Structure formats: C-alpha cells, structure tokens
UniProtKB/Swiss-Prot annotation:
Its main location: virion. This is Hexon-interlacing protein LH3. Belongs to the atadenoviridae LH3 protein family. It is found in: Virion. It comes from Snake adenovirus serotype 1 (SnAdV-1). Homotrimer. Interacts with hexon protein; this interaction tethers the hexons together. Structural component of the virion that presumably stabilizes the groups of hexons but is dispensable for assembly. Keywords: Virion.
Length: 373
C-alpha cells in the first residue's frame, strides 16, 4: 500500500481502504490496541490505527518523523500528563503528521476548578520544537491545553519559521484551552477549526501566526494574550502576538453565552476574560479583519503605544445590557479604529472616538472604568 524511504514518498500514501472494516492482511504499519505505541512509532514511518478502536495511551514519546493515521480511533487518558509527547529538534525539525484521531481527556469538563500548574499537564499533544501537521482530529474535555507547542529555547536567528506548524479541520469541545503556542513558536497556521464549550480557544504567546476561518461557539474567550501567561515555555513571552486573526466567528463568546467562568487564574493573578482579550504594552495586536462577532465581547487593555489597531470589515452584533461590548482603555482609544463594519445598535463600543468609527455602527459611549482587567 505504501512505500516510504526516509519520509520521501515514492508512492501515494493511502489511508485505511475501508474505514468501517477490519481487514486482513492488515496494512503494513498497523498498530493494534494493546500493542506498544512507542515501539510502533519508533519502527515505522507511517502508522495506521484501527478504525473505531480505543487506545489507552499514557505519555507516549515520539522522537522521530512519523505519520499517524487514526481513522476515527480514540486515544484516551485520564491521568495528568500529555497523551502524546513529541520531542523534536530545533536545528533539524522532523515531520510529524497526526490525522483523524479523537483524544479524550475526561468524562466531562471541570469548569469550576481554578486553573493551576497541575492542570497544565493535562494535555493531548505536547510538542517541543515541532514541525507538525494536525488535521481532522477531535479533542474533548482536557483540563489543560489540548495542544501545547513549545520551543526548547528562544529563537533569535533564522530559525523562526522552521517549525511550520499547521493545525486544520479539528474539533475542540469542553477543553480549558484549545491550542497554546509558547514563546518563539512562530509562523504557525490554525485554520478551519471548530471550538465549542471551551474556556479559551487560542492561548497566544509566540507571534506571527495566521488564525483564519475558525469558529468559536459558546466559548468564553477565543483569543487571549497578556503577560505572565501559562504555557510560555522555555522561550518566555518573546516576540509575542501580532500575525493575523481573520475571517473567524465568535458566537456567544461573552459573559452570558457559555458555561465557563469569566474569571481565569494566571500564575500570578486572576483576570476577567473576554471573547478577545489583549493586555501587553510591549506587543502589537494581530491584523483583525473580516471577523464575525455575534455577542462576542472584546477587551483591549494594553498594546504597544506606537502602534494602531483596526477592526476592519467585520460583523458586530450585541444585545441588551453589556452583552458583546468592545471596550478599549481610555489612554489607547484614539489609536483604535472601527472601519467598514456592519452591526446593530445593541453592539456597544466603549471609549473609541466617534470619528474613528466609519461608518457609524453600534452604540458608542465613554466609560473610564472599562475595560476591567
């Protein structure tokens, strides 16, 4: 079925030929439930998992290039550690591809327990110095970040783009955090992913990511960046944020539209989340264009003072009370523009000058007490 030499494909890699069938003879590289995943990943360049099977994995370590095709199988672990730990090489990134796996972190989300250092270990995938493609996977009920991408050291030379992380067509449900990228994990792509009932979708540290075409419904926060974050990793909060955040949907990502608390415990303080939350005077915001905010609030507390921020070409819809408020710190409000957006009167825009909202949309007001960190 396949022929792979040093990960250079000389014949097309076909997935399991009949997703509902258990075939004999099995495709080369098939990993059966109960067999050692460490041995299979070390021995094969392409590994097939059995359609519909369940695999109970605990801290499986990958140290070489491998492509894993899940065919809707389930990887499950109720212990506080990553299910798969990928240990790459910063200077010579290795290609790892994970496709069509379902990862289950627990029976249900534990929304009322404050986040802590212990919970950060409850992950599906912990990837150090990765060059990884994750496609078509599902992640359910993880107490920490379902996917954590980390750099082993700060990148200051020409290695920024070597990781080339791509996360596409995945589902996240009931997770504390969906995707966390640490410092110096840059130039990644997260596209066409669907988040539901998560507290935070993107825990953003490393910069220059493109996040496009993602949907967050009934999540408390789609985009979080501040200082002193969880999952900063060995590289710290270096060269953070910016990049692009375009054509995404924030649906009921506000204080009343989901089951997660607004309060979020960071290592040194508690913050009050928003659908889009940014608080770092040393960082630039991402390009923000074409996003749909249907009852999705926004807090812009701090950003680099010599920069501006434009909410461009979006759909801004709010409701009664404070549902779906866009609030900007007074000191920075003149640097924020709302250009070419549609919306309704229920959308409140706080502290942005009227001259910066073209055409007029929503209901503008001034309030020096907003946004509250």
């Amino acid at each position: 079925m396949t022929s792979v030499e040093d990960l250079y494909v000389v014949k097309p890699i076909n997935q399991w030929p009949a997703p509902s069938a258990f075939l004999y003879p099995l495709p080369r590289g098939t990993l059966l439930p109960g067999q050692s995943p460490d041995e299979a990943f070390a021995r094969n360049s392409v590994v097939f998992l059995v359609p519909g099977a369940e695999y109970n994995w605990k801290n499986v370590v990958i140290r070489k290039p491998v492509w894993i095709y899940g065919e809707r199988c389930h990887g499950e672990d109720f212990r506080p550690r990553a299910i798969i730990h990928i240990m790459g090489d910063l200077d010579n990134p290795m290609d790892v591809r994970i496709q069509d796996l379902t990862f289950i972190g627990g029976d249900s989300p534990d929304r009322l327990v404050p986040f802590s250092a212990v919970l950060t270990n409850q992950m599906a995938l912990w990837c150090i110095d990765p060059r990884i493609t994750i496609r078509g996977c599902s992640f359910y009920n993880f107490g920490g970040a379902a996917i954590y991408l980390e750099r082993s050291e700060r990148d200051t030379g020409f290695r920024f783009g070597r990781g080339q992380v791509m996360i596409t067509d995945c589902r996240f449900r009931g997770c504390r955090i969906g995707i966390a990228n640490g410092g110096s994990v840059e130039y990644g792509l997260a596209s066409q992913n669907n988040f539901s009932d998560c507290q935070i979708c993107f825990n953003v540290v490393g910069g220059n990511w493109t996040r496009s075409g993602n949907v967050a419904s009934n999540c408390r926060c789609m985009y979080l960046h501040t200082q002193g974050m969880w999952y900063e990793g060995a590289a710290g909060n270096f060269n953070p944020a910016h990049g692009s955040f375009t054509s995404n949907t924030l649906n009921h990502c506000d204080y009343g539209g989901n089951l997660w608390p607004t309060e979020f415990q960071l290592p040194d303080r508690v913050i009050n989340l928003a659908g889009f939350y940014f608080d770092n005077a040393a960082a630039r915001l991402p390009n923000f264009s074409g996003n749909s905010q249907w009852y999705g609030d926004m807090k812009l507390i701090n950003f680099l003072p010599d920069s501006t921020f434009v909410i461009n070409g979006g759909a801004l819809y709010g409701g009664p009370g404070d549902t779906g408020v866009i609030a900007v710190a007074t000191a920075l409000a003149a640097k924020v523009f709302v250009i070419g957006c549609q919306g309704n009167a229920g959308q409140q825009i706080v502290n942005v000058p009227a001259a910066n909202i073209i055409p007029e949309v929503g209901t503008r007001k001034d309030d020096a007490t907003q946004p509250a960190a």
